[in-house]
Amino acid sequence: MEPRTANRGAPHETDGNFYSWPGEKAQLPPLFPPPVEAASLFVGPVMHARLKPKSHRFRYDVFSLLIDLDRLPEAGRTTRLFSVGRFNLVSFFERDHGVADGRALVESTRETLAQAGVDLAGGRILLLCYPRVLGYQFNPIATYWCYDANGALRAVIYEVTNTFRERHAYVAPVRPGELTTAGLRQSRDKIMYVSPFLNMDMTYAFRMRPPGDTVRLRILESDPEGPVLSATFAGERRPLTDRTLARLCAATPFMTLKITAAIHWEALRLWLKGLALVDHPPAPADASSVDAPGPIRHAAHDRAAWRSITASALRRHDR
């Protein structure tokens, strides 16, 4: 007869990736395991909402590429309309990201993680970004999802690029409590100039659902008085096939060029609304930063802003 087992109660979240019972070392599978493919697509709307001093919103349909940096040759053989390192209808070039110092992107990214104290122990690095379309690309933000060998998310790198082609990577190790069943919550102080209408004394609050069947990216930018700007992307995963690429490029032709044009068009609209211009300070001396999480400013206002933004996005998406 087997001994009776005492009621163990609820499992404890240990490090944001694994759950274990009190007094036990056994671990359940990690939260949000990454897709197994070398590359896939995420399709959906991106929305920006300026909250003050003037209200301003826009929404565009886009598609992003999720690619395994250790499996670039395999990804490049997936379909005829997609290539790695050479021109095609849709393509990916390593030099469009990271420090672009001639090394393999995965190598330089692992070094950046090591400098932040993150060792993936043979795990994977998946990059979510806009690909080149007919040779042109621009990525306002690209995210590196960094997993250990067990598939647990250990860090995210938020790579921000402005229209001056200045680039900075915010390296964010996943700390205890940041990753839960609701997703990932992180924050960082703003270091690099991005917009002529946004001051530098600001904080980014990242609320993410890591890539799986879906991906959700939500960024709330706040100044000392409260939320100023939100940006969201809600993507559904699609296979990287010739048919999917052909349909997406037909539906959103010259997508990456339109992203750059849209940034300047929306900036003109903000200027016409009377927003003051902000001086452009020098770019950060370092290509990446691993500062501590930024302060959570005006949490109640942030929650209200997220509810309003999310409700608006859902209404637009359902139309």
Spans of features found by a protein language model:
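Mature, function-bearing regions of proteins
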Residues: E2-P3, F18-R319
